[in-house]
Amino acid sequence: GIEEIIATGEFSKISGAVDEDAEDGPQNLRGFHTAEKMLFLDGEPRDLETSPFAKNELEYLKLVSERMLSDTQDLYNGWLKGLGTSDVPSSYAEAMKKHDGSAYSIGNVYQAIELMLYGNNGMAGISNEVGSAKITDPVTAWNGSNKDATDPNNPGVLAVESWYSWNSLDDYKNNIVSIKNAYFGGRDLDEESASESSLH
């Protein structure tokens, strides 16, 4: 895990061509929450005067940050122009707009809308993840625990997604706000002010 990598400086698990499966270890050792663990302590930004970074932590944080930047660039480029790979050969945005079957098997407007609304990566998938996993898992674990929030091994505390920074509630709220924004076609819109791009 993260602590082992920091202790040993064995970064081969997280850099270079490693397993990209979201369910497998390497992918889960180099994302946002890994950086969060190193930047926050007990829900507060880490005080470097009292808790300075060790050499391996700095290197780990650098590698994780580079990976997040690369992933963000790939997401942007995949949407805008494609990555030229078998998974993302051309612009996903254009495929959604054209919905003519020429790319990504999006053959009509209904398939494009269905992708946005349903499935693991659609609005329904995100809202279900917030409700059934991000909120339910910690509550269930907490209810079955000693209910001691100061216990560093309390499963209810450890099940909270952003427990290093304690930003989980903001994360959950913003997940739902992102669904609302996508549904109404812009930020801070509603039924009365929905844009032409709205699914409403």
Identify the function of each model-found stretch.
Residues 1-200:
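Mature extracytoplasmic or organellar-lumen-exposed domains after removal of signal/transit peptides
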